[in-house]
Swiss-Prot record:
It comes from the Archaea. Belongs to the UPF0147 family. Pfam families: UPF0147. This is UPF0147 protein MM_1385.
Length: 93
């Protein structure tokens, strides 16, 4: 089993935040989805919570967003990729 160091997990979070930022600045994305993305960014930036808990909370919101019928296809793909990246963060950190 491959172990990720906390630096790897921090890098995953940093990359996810960059993608989330690009989604919030995309005017083709509906406002309710951009609000949810901002909420995810706040969760991921909240360092008072454990990293795995921030990732799990974010994945839950991403799953809700991905089911929105108004979500543009290119954004849906980004959201699936974000979810996959966040799932690589181990629970035991």
């Amino acid at each position: 089993m491959i172990q990720m160091s906390s630096n790897d997990s921090s890098e995953v979070i940093r990359q996810c935040l960059q993608v989330l930022e690009s989604i919030t600045s995309d005017s083709s994305v509906p406002r309710n989805i951009r609000r949810s993305v901002n909420e995810i960014m706040d969760i991921l930036n909240n360092e008072s919570e454990p990293l795995f808990l921030r990732a799990a909370s974010s994945i839950s919101i991403l799953e809700d967003i991905s089911n929105d019928p108004n979500l543009p296809l290119h954004t849906r793909t980004l959201i699936w990729n974000l979810s996959s990246q966040l799932e690589t963060i181990p629970v035991d950190e």
